[in-house]
A protein has these predicted regions:
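Long, compositionally biased, glycine/small-hydrophobic-enriched stretches that function as flexible linkers
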Residues: 1-200, 204-215, 368-520, 524-536, ...
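Active-site/ligand-binding-proximal alpha/beta "capping" segment
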Residues: 313-341, 345-348
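Short catalytic-loop micro-motif centered on adjacent basic/acidic residues
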Residues: 245-248, 311-316, 398
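Short, solvent-exposed amphipathic alpha-helical segments in soluble enzyme
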Residues: 263-265, 328-332, 413-416, 525, ...
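Residue-level detector of anion-binding/catalytic polar loops
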Residues: 268, 333, 396
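Catalytic or ion-translocation cores adjacent to nucleophile or general acid/base/metal-coordination motifs
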Residues: 207-231, 235, 241-245, 249-309, ...
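Solvent-exposed alpha-helices and their adjacent loops that cap or buttress functional pockets
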Residues: 151-152, 169-173, 188-189, 237-241, ...
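Glycine-rich beta-alpha junction loops
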Residues: 276, 318-321, 340-345, 401-407, ...
């Protein structure tokens, strides 16, 4: 690996090389994506090759076609491994990027963070998290995009079609520097197999949420929300987390936050994971305390932790179904239960069935996808049956928005309520995140210190904490608990050692909090106390995502299957000052089940940045509160009325509540 600043700049500016780089081998030490489904016909495979070769000069086609054929045959996709860059992949300080526009340089920083091997799940396949959450489809797209970003000025906009850089178009300084779409399909063509087919053809990709939108900040990105969920789960069952047991699964890019969240909440977390590389990554990063591979040893360890009321997180190397079944036999009481396997992607490595090893599963999904699907559905039925035995004993189980209940129901598992319509278990958004956070406007605000300096992150933590404490002094009773939890979070952020990759922080905040924190950052930048700051959020937020099985699962007026909110949100962000915007298909629950979007905004200390953040952040939160209010969510009605008092130009249509006796 060559990594001088000169090499880095030259390869960025070069884009797709004028001469072919040396062919790169398949690195067995890296966590790779499983082989994808062989779904293309012979003619479609020719089309996939034509599509891949169009990035290169015709003189290279004869050599590359054999290589790309081999990749398509071996992996089900054409990743163009040869074109992986020779420099180290990580979020460099913003001043090291050879860019004319600081906004573009910030986006380059964020892209490289998403592909950092310490951060990304399958870095060589350009997958950040979730098994198939892609930044790009291939390395040619990466190289071309970085070249465009280096060349562009602040009067241009880069247009990204599902990882493909369509080009730089004239715009203006107030327009976004980049507009991203991922997986935008004609509605009738959005099934799992449609993703397999059109992704293999090289014409679309699944961007998950923050993968394809360049806003991932490692597992920290979900740990605050997971901590809120675990804490409030224990509050819901009126039990202290001390000595309580939380059983779940997954140690990937998002699910890997669970053990850390359990530690912060103060409980015993048992998190099952079948992939030893994922376990090793999270253990080495300090995101899980202990690793156990024997069920008997796990049982003894949990009983000991219960007796001592320890705070500890334990990774079990194996299938979570085995854990649920063993704990039932051993009569270990589980207080909270959930699941964070990637069931948005059930047939291509998102969920590994009990009874098969990781290697056996990967071989079967490649050789006989129908048989693998049967094994997954059989496992889901067994999984749900084991969970049901625990809930009969008092376990509080919730769906973590990963399509567990959805796919279990499709498999015929016993997860339906007596009415045959609803699930017997709630989504965490229905019970916790929706009414407590989203309806009041609280969601996963985040920022990245573009200098890469940990001292800048410390300073921004202190600034954010001071702002929240000032807000809390006059805040209404309805949001005091949220502010209290968030102040405690930011105060303990440094000691919890959350950073993996870029110097970033996540903090749940409402519109008032986000705007005041951003303004305080911008002032600190103007005064040269800190470097540039990149603002953003998860798509999993108040306004960003329409998802009937997760983000909008607590919308009960029938509109949870509509996507007006997410579409309006990205359009509104685009002309209110975002540096880049994105809109995706399927984030979280899966392709065809969701429309989700996000933004990034660069703060440079200017008055212009102050105006942009005020306008855009206010809209970015209150759009969703208005929609939730119209759905008759009382917490949202309260929040939008408050917002209208603060901003006289905001006039929102409020619902009239119907007397149930009239119906």
């Amino acid at each position: 690996m060559i990594d001088t600043q000169n090499t880095f700049e030259n390869q960025i500016l070069e884009g797709i090389p004028a001469s072919l780089p040396t062919k790169k081998g398949y690195d067995e030490h890296v966590n790779h994506a499983p082989k994808r489904k062989d779904i293309l016909t012979a003619e479609e495979k020719k089309l996939a090759l034509k599509n891949a070769l169009r990035y290169f000069d015709k003189s290279f086609h004869a050599e590359l076609i054999e290589e790309f054929k081999e990749e398509l045959d071996l992996y089900g996709r054409i990743y163009m491994y040869r074109f992986r860059p020779d420099y180290e992949m990580y979020a460099r300080p913003i001043n090291q990027y050879p860019a004319k526009s600081k906004h573009a340089a910030a986006i380059m920083l964020m892209i490289m963070n998403n592909l950092d091997p310490k951060v990304a799940q399958h870095p060589h396949e350009l997958i950040t998290y979730g098994g198939n959450g892609a930044v790009f489809q291939n390395w040619a797209q990466y190289r071309l995009t970085m070249k465009y970003l280096a060349e562009m000025n602040d009067e241009q906009t880069l247009v990204m079609y599902s990882g493909h850089p369509m080009g730089l178009f004239p715009s203006n300084r107030n327009a976004p520097r980049v507009v991203v779409t991922n997986g935008m399909m004609i509605p009738n063509y959005s099934s799992q197999d449609d993703w397999e087919k059109f992704n293999a053809l090289g014409v679309t990709q699944y961007g998950q949420m923050t993968a394809g939108s360049y806003m991932y900040i490692g597992p920290q990105g979900i740990v605050h929300g997971t901590t809120i969920t675990v804490l409030n789960g224990f509050r819901k069952i009126k039990k202290s987390p001390e000595g309580g047991v939380f059983v779940t699964s997954g140690l990937g890019g998002m699910s890997g936050a669970q053990p850390k969240a359990g530690n912060i909440a103060g409980c015993i977390t048992v998190c099952a994971e079948v992939n030893p590389k994922a376990i090793a990554t999270r253990h080495s990063q300090g995101w899980v305390d202990e690793v156990v591979s024997d069920l008997g040893e796990l049982t003894a360890r949990v009983k000991k932790a219960q007796a001592a009321k320890e705070t500890v997180s334990i990774a079990y190397e194996g299938n979570v179904v085995e854990v649920w079944e063993k704990f039932d036999v051993e009569n270990i009481h589980v207080d909270l239960g959930s699941d964070q396997t990637s069931l948005h992607n059930p047939w291509a490595g998102g969920y590994y069935p009990v009874g098969l090893t990781l290697e056996e599963s990967q071989a079967l999904m490649a050789s006989n996808s129908d048989a693998f699907k049967e094994k997954v559905q059989e496992s889901l039925r067994r999984h749900a049956a084991a969970v049901n035995k625990h809930t009969d004993k008092g376990t509080y189980f919730f769906d973590y928005g990963n399509a567990f209940l959805l796919e279990a129901s499709r498999a015929g598992a016993d997860v339906m309520a007596s009415n045959g319509i609803d699930f017997k278990y709630p989504s965490y958004v229905q019970d916790i995140m929706g009414p407590m956070c989203f309806d009041y406007g609280f969601g996963p605000f985040r920022w990245v210190c573009a200098s890469g300096d940990p001292e800048d992150l410390k300073k921004t933590d202190a600034i954010a904490c001071q702002v929240l404490e000032e807000i809390k002094e006059t805040a209404p009773e309805e949001i005091q608990k949220q502010l209290e939890d968030n102040i405690q979070w930011i105060k303990s952020a440094q000691e919890n050692k959350l950073v993996v990759g870029s110097q970033a922080r996540i903090l749940y905040a409402d519109a008032e909090g986000r705007i005041k924190i951003a303004k305080a950052f911008n002032k600190a930048i103007e005064e040269n106390k800190i470097g540039f700051v990149i603002l953003g959020r998860d798509h999993h937020d108040v306004s960003g995502t329409d998802s009937p099985y997760r983000e909008t699962s607590n919308i009960y007026d029938g509109s949870s299957f509509t996507a007006d909110m997410a579409i309006h949100n990205v359009i509104g962000d685009s002309f209110r000052g975002a540096s880049w915007v994105s809109i995706h298909n399927g984030g979280g629950v899966g392709w065809g089940e969701v429309i989700n979007g996000g933004f990034g905004m660069v703060l440079d200390g200017s008055m212009e940045a102050d105006k942009r953040l005020q306008s855009m952040l206010f809209w970015d939160v209150n759009n969703g509160i208005a929609r939730r209010s119209w759905a008759r969510n009382e917490e949202a009605v309260f929040a939008i009325k408050r917002a209208m008092q603060v901003e006289p130009d905001l006039k929102v249509t409020l619902p009239s509540f119907v007397d149930e006796d009239l119906l």
